[in-house]
């Protein structure tokens, strides 16, 4: 990459820091998760949660959502200017679950946002600690990615629902900064840009005036983020075309959809980080561990180690399978929703099954669900091996994939060949190579056609024993490539937003 010199590692983006060496990065990431842990402990005290209740993932999510809501400036401002009946713009809350006489009860709590902000800042040495907030957003985003399909959102923007492997981070708020941008998939960026262009088509003032100038800057910035994810010159050149367009319209939408399709084979670089629920960091801080002193990394062994030693509980509905509930959360913790199931299974040490075969709904419980029948279980979040998370799409080559999801986006740097369904993908590229991007389109199609099965991605990278913290002895697994590798294969997962 030409721009390598100016790139910050995404640990640095995560902590908002300038260039730092490895030790400083580990320390600042440690400070970030330590702050989350301290905040969580304080909230458990405020809410008088028992140790068990504090380890309940549903309680963790409510507490995380409260602090995110308390710091959501734009929404807070909007709520104050547009008061809606029954919603106090100065308060935030949610369901907290407590165990009374052997039964789980739901308690709706309400707190002043100001109070939550005070507790958060106090846990973070008086700072706003936006990095920690983004970290929580990415954990929620990873959980959504593992739980829901984005079929409807894809179809609405004119994309193919089988392109779901490109949709990482599609539920991340816009305000998630550089760290958020790094984990967004190519499809997510394309979808955001298409929505913007469509608004411009329908509203002639969208690009005009002082607001329009700001809109234009945002548009070009998003184009540059997407351009930076592509690994080939032709894809990047096409992004320049889209960015420089005087009046973005249907031609740009066409180009973007073409680029999204091309990313199924010529994969973009999408960062992966293991972001854990706040209660996990809370448990570790409570045990006396000093994250900042010891240092921490989101992409190495550390999150695996935390999960090896933490007990997290979850509420479970009567007909749900605890093993499946655990798989869902494990995938979310490691940002592995679009990873090849064979790789995930090897690392986890137990079979990871496609979404359609899971007997479990999402982790969160709706307010109208009956608590009488709820039970709780221990989530099994341990793994057999660990592997370094990747920020590249790997080299591409051909391999059998499935009907429901026709490509993968690797999470772990593990040597393998990457499955994609060439016939299905190439069928979408018939005909249309005319117009101002014709030479780039032709070049991209040529590269896609010549992607070979022999090319192994992540040459020589493997998985590591949990005792091998310095990653000295890679174990390169061999995968049975005749099996199915896609998670959203022929799937019936719920839509996000139900």
Swiss-Prot record:
Which modifications occur after translation, per UniProt? Answer: Late in virus-infected cells, may be cleaved from a 56-kDa protein to a 53-kDa protein by a cellular caspase. This cleavage might be a marker for the onset of apoptosis in infected cells or have a specific function in virus host interaction.
An example Gene Ontology CC term for this record: ribonucleoprotein complex
Motif residue range(s): Unconventional nuclear localization signal:
1-18
Q: Name one Pfam family in it.
A: Flu_NP
Kindly give the InterPro entries that the UniProt entry links to this protein.
Answer: Flu_NP
Give one GO biological process term. Answer: symbiont entry into host cell
Keywords tagged on the record: Capsid protein, Helical capsid protein, Host nucleus, Host-virus interaction, Ribonucleoprotein, RNA-binding, Viral nucleoprotein, Viral penetration into host nucleus, Virion, Virus entry into host cell
Locate the motif Bipartite nuclear localization signal. Answer: 198-216
Gene Ontology molecular-function annotations: RNA binding; structural molecule activity
Where is the protein situated, by its record's location annotation?
A: Virion; Host nucleus
What is the predominant subcellular site recorded for this chain?
A: virion
Where in this protein does the record put region Disordered?
1-21
Highest taxon listed in the record's lineage: Viruses
Query: What is this protein's function?
Result: Encapsidates the negative strand viral RNA, protecting it from nucleases. The encapsidated genomic RNA is termed the ribonucleoprotein (RNP) and serves as template for transcription and replication. The RNP needs to be localized in the host nucleus to start an infectious cycle, but is too large to diffuse through the nuclear pore complex. NP comprises at least 2 nuclear localization signals that are responsible for the active RNP import into the nucleus through cellular importin alpha/beta pathway.
Q: How does it assemble?
A: Homomultimerizes to form the nucleocapsid. May bind host exportin-1/XPO1. Binds to viral genomic RNA. Protein-RNA contacts are mediated by a combination of electrostatic interactions between positively charged residues and the phosphate backbone and planar interactions between aromatic side chains and bases.
Q: Which family does it belong to?
A: Belongs to the influenza viruses nucleoprotein family.
- Its protein name is Nucleoprotein
Q: Which organism is it from?
A: Influenza A virus (strain A/Swine/Italy/839/1989 H1N1)
């Amino acid at each position: 990459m030409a721009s390598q010199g100016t790139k910050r590692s995404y640990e640095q983006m995560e902590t908002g820091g300038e260039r730092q060496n490895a030790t400083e990065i580990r320390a600042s990431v440690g400070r970030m998760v330590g702050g989350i842990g301290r905040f969580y402990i304080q909230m458990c005290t405020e809410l008088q949660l028992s140790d068990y209740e504090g380890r309940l993932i549903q309680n963790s999510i409510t507490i995380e959502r409260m602090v995110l809501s308390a710091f959501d400036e734009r929404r807070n401002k909007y709520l104050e200017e547009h008061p809606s009946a029954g919603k106090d713009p100065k308060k935030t809350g949610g369901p907290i679950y407590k165990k009374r006489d052997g039964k789980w009860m739901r308690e709706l709590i309400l707190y002043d946002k100001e109070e939550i902000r005070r507790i958060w800042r106090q846990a973070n040495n008086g700072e706003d600690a936006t990095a920690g907030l983004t970290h929580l957003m990415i954990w929620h985003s990873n959980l959504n990615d593992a739980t829901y399909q984005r079929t409807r959102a894809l179809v609405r923007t004119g994309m193919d629902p089988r392109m779901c492997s490109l949709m990482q981070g599609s539920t991340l708020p816009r305000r998630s900064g550089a760290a958020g941008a790094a984990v967004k998939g190519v499809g997510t960026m394309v979808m955001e840009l298409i929505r913007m262009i469509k608004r411009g088509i329908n509203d002639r003032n969208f690009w005009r005036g002082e607001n329009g100038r700001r809109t234009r800057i945002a548009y070009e910035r998003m184009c540059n983020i997407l351009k930076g994810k592509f690994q080939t010159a032709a894809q990047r050149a096409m992004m320049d075309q889209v960015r420089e367009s005087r009046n973005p319209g249907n031609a740009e939408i066409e180009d973007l959809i073409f680029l999204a399709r091309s990313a199924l084979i010529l994969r973009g670089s999408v960062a992966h980080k293991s972001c854990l629920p706040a209660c996990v960091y809370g448990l570790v801080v409570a045990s006396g561990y000093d994250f900042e002193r010891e240092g921490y990394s989101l992409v190495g062994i550390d999150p695996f180690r935390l999960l090896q030693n933490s007990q997290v509980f979850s509420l479970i509905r009567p007909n749900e399978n605890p093993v499946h509930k655990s798989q869902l959360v494990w995938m979310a913790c490691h940002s592995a929703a679009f990873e090849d199931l064979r790789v995930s299974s090897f690392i986890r040490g137990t079979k990871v099954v496609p979404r359609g075969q899971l007997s479990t709904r999402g982790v969160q419980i709706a307010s109208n669900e009956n608590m009488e029948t709820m039970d709780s279980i221990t989530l099994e979040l341990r793994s057999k091996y660990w592997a370094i998370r990747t920020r590249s799409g790997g080299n591409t080559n051909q391999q059998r994939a499935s009907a429901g999801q026709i490509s993968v986006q690797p999470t772990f740097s593990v040597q393998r060949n990457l499955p994609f369904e060439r016939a299905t993908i190439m069928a979408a590229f018939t005909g249309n190579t005319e117009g101002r991007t014709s030479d780039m389109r032709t070049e991209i199609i040529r590269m896609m056609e010549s992607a070979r099965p022999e090319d192994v991605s992540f040459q020589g990278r493997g998985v590591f024993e949990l005792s091998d913290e310095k990653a000295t002895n890679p174990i390169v697994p061999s995968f049975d490539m005749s099996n199915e590798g896609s998670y959203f294969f022929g799937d019936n997962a719920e839509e996000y937003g139900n």
